[in-house]
Amino acid sequence: MAASRYRRFLKLCEEWPVDETKRGRDLGAYLRQRVAQAFREGENTQVAEPEACDEMYESLARLHSNYYKHKYPRPRETSFSGLSLEEYKLILSTDTLDEFKEMNKGTWKKLQEKFAPGSPEGKHTAWARALPRPRT
């Protein structure tokens, strides 16, 4: 029975899309990682709690098949902000979020990052390079 559970999870992982714009935050990538951890021995893995495993699979399968989207249809395909799906994907991409973090940094934090290298020895040389040399 563990072999059929493993195959069902593998099939679900194959069908679940991976969004490359959400590096490190994508549900599809996380799902693949968790299945690999849970079924380390592949089809020979012994499942400690088969009922919980089956419930988890059924929940993920409902999400993947858009069960709730069809059960609770929306009258319009807009959000409260009026943005489209593509605009949300752009805003929530990892690159855009990194840009927002950079924009929200204060001047002091930007200066610290610019002049403070990782090692303590490097701090002195970075400040020495940043200070103007006296004219002789």
Swiss-Prot record:
Its main location: mitochondrion. GO terms for biological process: mitochondrial respiratory chain complex III assembly; positive regulation of mitochondrial translation; regulation of insulin secretion; regulation of oxidative phosphorylation; regulation of skeletal muscle cell differentiation. Keywords: Membrane, Mitochondrion, Mitochondrion inner membrane, Mitochondrion nucleoid, Transit peptide. Residues 1-13 form a transit peptide. It is found in: Mitochondrion matrix, Mitochondrion nucleoid; Mitochondrion; Mitochondrion intermembrane space; Mitochondrion matrix. Residues 114-136 are annotated as: Disordered. It comes from the Eukaryota. Disulfide bonds: none annotated. GO terms for cellular component: mitochondrial inner membrane; mitochondrial intermembrane space; mitochondrial matrix; mitochondrial nucleoid; mitochondrion; nuclear body. PANTHER family: UBIQUINOL-CYTOCHROME-C REDUCTASE COMPLEX ASSEMBLY FACTOR 2. Interacts with UQCC1. Forms a complex, named COMB/coordinator of mitochondrial CYTB biogenesis, composed of UQCC1, UQCC2, UQCC4, UQCC5 and UQCC6; stabilizes nascent cytochrome b/MT-CYB and promotes its membrane insertion. Forms a complex, named COMB/coordinator of mitochondrial CYTB biogenesis, composed of UQCC1, UQCC2, UQCC4, UQCC5 and UQCC6; stabilizes nascent cytochrome b/MT-CYB and promotes its membrane insertion. Forms a complex, named COMA, composed of UQCC1, UQCC2 and UQCC4; activates MT-CYB translation. Required for the assembly of the ubiquinol-cytochrome c reductase complex (mitochondrial respiratory chain complex III or cytochrome b-c1 complex). Plays a role in the modulation of respiratory chain activities such as oxygen consumption and ATP production and via its modulation of the respiratory chain activity can regulate skeletal muscle differentiation and insulin secretion by pancreatic beta-cells. Involved in cytochrome b translation and/or stability. This is Ubiquinol-cytochrome c reductase complex assembly factor 2.
